[in-house]
Design a protein with these regions (language model features):
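Anionic ligand-binding catalytic core segments
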Residues: 1-319, 323-446
Length: 446
């Protein structure tokens, strides 16, 4: 590709207010400048803690700008390639991709041509879809378009971060709809993962696995995204209600709620989402959450999640799977938990399995050294982390509570399993959870 010969720009909007301009100069690093009216607005707040309001409205430049916007996109290069092919973008760069699909991003952000403005923000518009139409849409999500093929869905452009195949729709008036104009989506549809990783672990039941893990966390008292298993024709999905959407008090339109994940908070690229790849860890998250409007509760949720990830053998609790809701006046708080999956249903050393002995937490427990392998983590490490996170002298009351809750949690969630829920998934997750709780209960606290 030849050298860029002219400056390019996209305008950034939130709920009908212009936030600023993202610019790609002909030379030098990319830039982001807040609109003075947004800085002065009662709704105004930084896009990210890594891109704060600054005296004199100084323009932000460089990697933090790129990494904020790049983190709005899917992590997977294969998914990015499909987006580029479908919308015929010149490159896989964040600017090109978001120019094509940035109308409905995570949080409040909409990206439009620099001279455009979102129309119809204060109304809800959409086209109702039948189950067969949704089934066809889901099939298109995981396929590359035929040469020269275009259809109405090509004008439905959304950007969903993460490594998993997914799309999103609007739920309104008791119907699934494809939103129009400035109307946002309200639910994310996540498709089964299939074979994953170097050993091709069989996560074809990822929809049921994630649903069950979320119900378990909720039963322990942790805030989680609302989710439901749904079937459209032959296609099974996990429908996740977006907690970055809210019906306006008038009941007439949907608000987009500002939020960011912890890669964006720290201005790091998505390929560094795991701590062992240079990404944020538990102490980094806790450092931010100490200034939350609900600091003690948020840090407890963070610590409880790590204990339960260990009990569930859930290895994917990385920085992109924790987010903060950005509030007015520069305040913030932790969002509900999301994207949690256990390896217990596929644990083993054979083909299409995932060895527990080799699996790790995405974020390590630190004492005098690093402990992230499931087999190495001890109760005392959770206690040390509680002290280092300024939660308390230790995590013993929290640990004991989680252990004591486990039988009731298993009984309650087991009673709520949907019809035809795969027995192996439930049995192995419940068995692993019960065994981990017993093991944790026998470990010395120090």
């Amino acid at each position: 590709m030849g050298r860029q010969t002219h400056s390019r720009a996209l305008s950034v909007w939130a709920n009908g207010e212009r936030v600023g301009v993202w610019r790609l100069p002909t030379r030098g690093p990319m830039e982001f400048a807040y609109d003075p009216a947004w800085v002065a607005s009662p709704a105004g707040r930084p896009l990210s803690l890594s891109l704060p309001f600054a005296p004199g409205n100084v323009v932000h430049k460089g990697p933090r700008v790129l990494n904020y916007f790049d983190n709005l996109l899917p992590d997977s290069e294969a998914i990015r390639k499909r987006i580029a092919q479908r919308y015929q973008t010149d490159t896989l760069d964040a600017f090109d991709l978001l120019q094509a699909i940035g109308r409905d991003c995570v949080g409040a952000v909409q990206l439009l041509a620099v001279d455009d403005a979102p129309a119809g923000v204060e109304r809800i518009e959409g086209t109702p879809l039948s189950d067969s139409e949704i089934e066809a849409m889901l099939a298109r999500t995981v396929s590359s378009p035929a040469l020269g093929a275009r259809d109405e869905a090509d004008d439905f452009r959304i950007s969903l971060a993460g490594a998993q195949e997914k799309t999103a729709l609007l739920w309104h008036d008791g119907k699934w709809q494809r939103p129009h104009g400035a109307t946002p989506t309200t639910h994310i549809f996540k498709l089964p993962l299939g074979l994953v990783g170097n050993k091709l672990a069989d996560l074809s039941t990822s929809v049921e696995n994630e649903w069950l893990c979320l119900q378990i966390l909720r039963a322990y008292g942790l805030p989680v995204a609302n989710a439901e298993i749904m079937t459209f024709g032959k296609q099974r999905v996990l429908s996740v209600e977006r907690f970055d959407r809210q019906l306006h008090s008038s009941g007439q339109w949907l608000l987009r709620l500002p939020q960011e994940d912890f890669c964006q908070v720290y201005g790091v690229p998505s390929h560094r989402k795991y701590e062992n790849e240079g990404g944020p860890g538990v102490l980094d998250l806790a450092r931010i959450l100490q200034q939350s409007v609900s600091a003690q509760q948020d840090i407890e949720t963070l610590l409880a999640s790590q204990i339960l990830f260990w009990m569930l053998a859930a290895p994917d609790g990385h920085a992109k799977n924790f987010s903060i809701r950005l509030l007015a006046g520069g305040q913030y708080r932790l969002t509900p938990l999301y994207d949690v999956m256990s390896i217990w249903p596929v644990e083993g050393n054979g083909p299409n399995q995932w060895s527990w002995f080799k699996a790790k937490l995405a974020m390590a427990m630190w004492s005098r050294s690093k402990h992230d392998a499931f087999r190495d983590v001890q109760r005392r490490h959770f206690n040390t982390m509680a002290l280092r996170c300024s939660y308390g002298a230790n995590a013993e009351p929290l640990i004991q509570r989680l252990i004591e809750q486990t039988p009731e949690v298993i009984a309650r969630v087991s009673a709520e399993l949907p019809e035809r829920f795969p027995g192996k998934v439930a049995e192995r997750i419940f068995k692993g959870l019960k065994s981990s709780a017993a093991t944790l209960g026998k470990m010395p606290p120090a």
